[in-house]
């Protein structure tokens, strides 16, 4: 299983990024293998529109099963849902990528069943 966590940096100790489409990085890990890969998303950080859809396409191309993020807009949510990628939301208590991954493994994050933002990550 591959999990992608929205991040401001490139490793498990990096701060999480609370916005899916405009996250600077996605830290990708297979919790069973303890491997880590980084997917840069800088092209979407300042995108005028379509950042969520483009980010979702990048995630889908990496065969991700689960996304952990603070917020996901409607277009990104629909794109992820269309390819059966589950989205889990973390709150303000989650500070690092490692915190998010641990909370998800322990069942402390809620699966998102609808967009959590109106768009543009807000």
Annotate the PLM regions.
Residues 1-50, 54, 61, 81-122:
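Non-catalytic interface/targeting segments
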Residues 57-60, 75:
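Charged/polar interaction segments and conserved charged motifs
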Residues 72-78:
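Short, glycine/polar-rich helix-capping loops at beta-to-alpha or helix-loop-helix junctions
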């Amino acid at each position: 299983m591959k999990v992608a966590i929205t991040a401001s940096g490139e490793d498990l100790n990096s701060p999480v990024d609370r916005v899916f489409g405009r996250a600077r990085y996605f830290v990708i890990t297979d919790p069973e293998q303890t491997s880590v890969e980084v997917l840069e998303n800088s092209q979407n950080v300042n995108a005028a529109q379509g950042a969520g859809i483009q980010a979702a396409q990048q995630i889908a191309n990496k065969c991700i099963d689960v996304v952990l993020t603070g917020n996901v807009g409607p277009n990104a949510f629909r794109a992820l849902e269309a390819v059966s990628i589950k989205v889990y939301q973390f709150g303000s208590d989650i500070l690092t990528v490692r915190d998010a991954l641990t909370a998800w493994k322990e069942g402390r994050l809620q699966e998102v069943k609808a967009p959590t933002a109106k768009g543009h990550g807000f």
